[in-house]
Regions:
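Short N-terminal binding/cap micro-motifs at the start of the first secondary-structure element
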Residues: 1
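C-terminal accessory helical subdomains adjacent to catalytic cores in phosphodiester-
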Residues: 4-21, 27, 33-49, 54-170
Length: 170
C-alpha cells in the first residue's frame, strides 16, 4: 500500500495498515481501530490515524470518526473526497476540475496507466510527495467540517508528519 513506502531499513517509524476488503464503512474502520488499540496500546510517541474515502458516506458517519480523532492528541483523521485516488493524483497535478470519482481515476490513469487501487506503484510517484502535500494544503478548505466537502484530501496532514519523521531519522 501507499503508506508502506515510509517504512525503510533506516526509518525510525513503522507504518501499519489495518485493511479489510469490502469493510470500509466508517463504523467498521473505527471498530477495527478500537480493537487494535485495545489489543496493543499506543506508546507515548505512537500515533493512530484513520484514513478513509468520503465515497458515499454521510456526514454523521464521518463525524463519528472525527469525534474519535479528537479524543487523544495521538489520534488523527485523514479523509479524501471522493477517494484516496485524489490524493495520488495530487502527486502529479493540482486536481482542479475533478467532479467525480470516475474523472479522478481517469486523470490518475494518465499518469499511472497500470493503476489499481489494491496495489499502488509508489516508485512511479517519483518525488511528487512534497508537491502533493503543498497542493492538498492549498486546497484544504475544511473549516468547521474537518473533511473536504468537495474534491480534496487531508491525507497531507499525516504524510507531512511521516516525511518529517523520515527526515529526522536520516
Amino acid at each position: 500500500t501507499y503508506f508502506k513506502m515510509f517504512n525503510g531499513a533506516e526509518a525510525t517509524i513503522l507504518v501499519e495498515c489495518l485493511r479489510a476488503k469490502n469493510r470500509s464503512a466508517p463504523e467498521r474502520v473505527l471498530k477495527r481501530m478500537k480493537q487494535r488499540l485495545a489489543a496493543e496500546k499506543l506508546r507515548q510517541q505512537d500515533e493512530a490515524w484513520l484514513v478513509v474515502d468520503k465515497d458515499s458516506w454521510n456526514g454523521n458517519q464521518l463525524q463519528q470518526l472525527y469525534q474519535w480523532s479528537t479524543g487523544d492528541k495521538r489520534y488523527g483523521l485523514a479523509v479524501s473526497n471522493p477517494a484516496f485516488e485524489y490524493w495520488l493524483l495530487l502527486h502529479f497535478e493540482d486536481g482542479k476540475g475533478v467532479n467525480s470519482l470516475r474523472e479522478c481515476r481517469d486523470r490518475l490513469k494518465r499518469h499511472l496507466p497500470e493503476f489499481h487501487k489494491s496495489h499502488v506503484e509508489v516508485h512511479k510517484l517519483g518525488n511528487g510527495t512534497r508537491d502533493a502535500i503543498r497542493r492538498a494544503r492549498m486546497r484544504d478548505q475544511t473549516g468547521r467540517q474537518k473533511w473536504p466537502k468537495t474534491c480534496g484530501s487531508t491525507v497531507y496532514r499525516l504524510v507531512e508528519q511521516l516525511v518529517a519523521d523520515e527526515k529526522e531519522s536520516n
